[in-house]
């Protein structure tokens, strides 16, 4: 089962990716992790990626596609894989198709922007332990304090409203057009496309995914 997850940052893809990986026994392929692993391995593609990144440039789509092809040929991908964070643009999706990387399901996590802002901006973390709270959905027992240690909770820089809104604008400009692209691909019979209501609870979304994926 080869799956692509689409959806804005904060739409709940990460939580459900864990569930899909465990239930269907497929690995999650994140381009960031893949690039780091390739550089570390010292492979030919890894060396190319390192040279580009050391020069402060963005890795080309061609190189990322080559890395994806190399990665999905590995033994743990024999039953499929879960792509998160790639493709991000229509040219990348086209390049994947041309490279013969077929996908069984494209899942779009649909959540209104304002709810995403609410979800992310309300996060509070206890940095030393990694415990995460939410002022509305999962508040600590004492406002602003960690339940276990009583230490101050902080807000991650990435969770500040201005940053979140900027990332949402980028998502709508760059990645949202993929929704139309894959909808057409599904109409042509090249993949299956499903919209998932990401405003539901984690358990409800999980149940919906089980219905979709079988």
Swiss-Prot record:
Ranges for region LID: 122-159
Superkingdom in the source lineage: Bacteria
Region (NMP): 30-59
InterPro entries: Adenyl_kin_sub, Adenylat/UMP-CMP_kin, Adenylat_kinase_CS, Adenylate_kinase_lid-dom, P-loop_NTPase
Catalytic activity: AMP + ATP = 2 ADP
EC category: transferase
Coiled coil: none
Keywords: Acetylation, ATP-binding, Cytoplasm, Kinase, Nucleotide biosynthesis, Nucleotide-binding, Transferase
Record GO cellular component, one term: cytoplasm
Modification sites for N6-acetyllysine: 192
Domain notes: Consists of three domains, a large central CORE domain and two small peripheral domains, NMPbind and LID, which undergo movements during catalysis. The LID domain closes over the site of phosphoryl transfer upon ATP binding. Assembling and dissambling the active center during each catalytic cycle provides an effective means to prevent ATP hydrolysis.
Quaternary structure annotation from Swiss-Prot or TrEMBL: Monomer.
Known function: Catalyzes the reversible transfer of the terminal phosphate group between ATP and AMP. Plays an important role in cellular energy homeostasis and in adenine nucleotide metabolism.
Protein name per its UniProtKB record: Adenylate kinase
Organism, as annotated: Shigella sonnei (strain Ss046)
């Amino acid at each position: 089962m080869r799956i692509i997850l689409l959806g804005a940052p904060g739409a709940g893809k990460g939580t459900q990716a864990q569930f899909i990986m465990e239930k269907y026994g497929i690995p999650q392929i994140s381009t960031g992790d893949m690039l780091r692993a390739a550089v570390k391995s010292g492979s030919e593609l890894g060396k190319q990626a390192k040279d580009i990144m050391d020069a402060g440039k963005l890795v080309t789509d061609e190189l990322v596609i080559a890395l994806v092809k190399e990665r999905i040929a590995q033994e743990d991908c024999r039953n499929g894989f879960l792509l998160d964070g790639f493709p991000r643009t229509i040219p990348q999706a086209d390049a994947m198709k041309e490279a013969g990387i077929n996908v069984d399901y494209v899942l779009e996590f649909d959540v209104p922007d304002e709810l995403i802002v609410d979800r992310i901006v309300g996060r509070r973390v206890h940095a030393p332990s990694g415990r995460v709270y939410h002022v509305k959905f999962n508040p600590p027992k004492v406002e602003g304090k960690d339940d276990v240690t009583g230490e101050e909770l902080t807000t991650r820089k990435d969770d500040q409203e201005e940053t979140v809104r900027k990332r949402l604008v980028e998502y709508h400009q760059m990645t949202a057009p993929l929704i139309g692209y894959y909808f057409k691909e599904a109409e042509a019979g090249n993949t299956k496309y499903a919209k998932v209501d990401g405003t539901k609870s984690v358990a409800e979304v999980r149940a919906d995914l089980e219905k979709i994926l079988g």
